């Protein structure tokens, strides 16, 4: 069974059962193969812990360092990385077939804002009543959107028609 470097299941100080170990001191210098008693006395003399890093069949690799300080910094690093992760939000904007130029420009600016923030934008174009007879007009609006946002966004999937809707998702380039 392989153990990950510095896992939570590392053996520390007297928990190490091997008679001899490969020792790396606190300055990361390879000391060599020594008895476990000598390795423990070296660790105690500098008030640090002897930690088994890799368990081999012959001689486990042990290092001298402050294990509690390492565990604290490792947990802090993990929590900091979780805080920095950004969840991707999908914003949805709905269009109608007979959208005016000003309304189109307002929604285009909203799309640009969402994309610049790193969000995905779902575009839904809805056909009402007999508008469904002219899906090519809806595709023209979608293609115009793709062209107008081509400098900052790209379509994640091709526009597809589902009933009386045409859907498409835009993502950052």
Swiss-Prot record:
This is Translation initiation factor IF-3. Monomer. The gene is infC. Its main location: cytoplasm. The keyword Nucleotide-binding does not apply. GO terms for cellular component: cytosol; membrane. GO terms for molecular function: ribosome binding; translation initiation factor activity. Pfam families: IF3_C, IF3_N.
């Amino acid at each position: 069974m392989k153990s990950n470097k510095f896992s939570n299941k590392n053996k520390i100080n007297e928990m190490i059962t091997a008679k001899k170990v490969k020792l790396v001191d606190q300055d990361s210098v390879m000391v060599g193969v020594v008895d476990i008693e000598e390795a423990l006395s070296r660790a105690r003399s500098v008030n640090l812990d002897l930690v088994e890093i890799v368990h081999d069949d012959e001689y486990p690799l042990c290092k001298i360092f402050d294990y509690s300080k390492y565990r604290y910094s490792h947990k802090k690093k993990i929590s900091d990385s979780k805080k920095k992760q950004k969840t991707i939000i999908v914003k949805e904007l709905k269009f109608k077939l007979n959208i005016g130029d000003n309304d189109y420009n307002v929604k285009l600016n909203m799309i640009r804002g969402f994309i610049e923030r790193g969000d995905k934008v779902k575009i839904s174009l809805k056909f009402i009543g007999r508008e469904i007879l002219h899906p090519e007009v809806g595709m023209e609006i979608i293609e115009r959107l793709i062209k107008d946002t081509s400098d900052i966004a790209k379509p994640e999937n091709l526009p597809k028609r589902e009933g009386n809707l045409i859907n498409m998702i835009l993502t950052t380039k």
